[in-house]
């Protein structure tokens, strides 16, 4: 419903239905984690991944949503991308549809406030914005997060801290980490996407030619099974230099 929305108002109405489910999931996670740090990555996959591709499945979903088959089929077609790995996903979704980031922030902060009040635990939400390649992207989404989070925390009358960080998974992000660090309180290196974008091939498609690369001694092993020290590792090292004012560095494999 949210994906098929034609206006901001329709999208916000659909997101309002999703929010309680996200909040419930986050509350369950915070209860399990206690005061241990937990990082929540905001919506990353392209939207087409949430829709069916087979006609019979589209027909069934259209009936459930009260749409015609043709209308839903057109939505699916409109979301098609030639290279979805580098397409409309990650922070780009939040820039295009800031109401998504606002909803996720409400779910995260409300969950943290509720579980903190219920258990007495000091919970510090760590919110991670994915696929940032330009500091202004991060600032745009961070402004949405901070506005929503600060309003909820003030309304609750508590002094809950939270952090906003990002994934370093685009080569440009690694090269401009010093600038991005001005808006991020932590980094997590997304080694899967960073490897894909540095090598220039998709993990899903590489099997078609990697066998020949092994046979011809071009690669000794799958670049996705270990961190490439010479190329990808160099980008990580450049991004993690000592003069960054970053509180926490991590990796997502």
Residue ranges and their predicted role:
Residues 1-253:
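Conserved alpha/beta-domain cores
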């Amino acid at each position: 419903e949210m994906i098929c929305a034609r206006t901001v108002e329709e999208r916000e109405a659909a997101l309002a239905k999703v929010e309680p489910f996200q909040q419930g999931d986050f509350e369950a996670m915070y209860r399990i984690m206690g005061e241990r740090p937990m990082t929540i990555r905001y919506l990353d996959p392209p939207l087409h991944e949430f829709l069916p591709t087979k006609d019979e499945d589209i027909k069934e979903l259209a009936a459930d949503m009260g749409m015609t088959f043709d209308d839903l089929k057109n939505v699916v077609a409109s979301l098609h991308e030639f290279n979805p790995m580098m397409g409309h996903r990650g922070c780009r979704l939040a820039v295009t549809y800031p109401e998504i980031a606002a909803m996720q922030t409400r779910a995260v902060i409300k969950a943290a406030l509720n579980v903190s009040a219920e258990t007495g635990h000091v919970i510090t939400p760590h919110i991670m914005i994915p696929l940032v390649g330009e500091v202004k992207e991060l600032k745009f989404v961070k402004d949405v997060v901070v506005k929503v989070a600060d309003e909820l925390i003030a309304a609750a009358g508590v002094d809950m801290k939270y952090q906003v960080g990002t994934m370093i998974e685009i080569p440009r992000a690694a090269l401009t980490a010093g600038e991005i660090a001005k808006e991020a309180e932590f980094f997590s290196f997304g080694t899967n996407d960073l490897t894909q974008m540095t090598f220039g091939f998709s993990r899903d498609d590489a099997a078609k030619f990697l066998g020949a690369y092994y046979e011809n001694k071009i690669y000794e092993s799958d670049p996705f099974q270990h961190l490439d020290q010479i190329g990808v590792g160099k980008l990580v090292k450049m991004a993690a230099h000592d003069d960054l004012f970053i509180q926490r560095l991590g990796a997502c494999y």
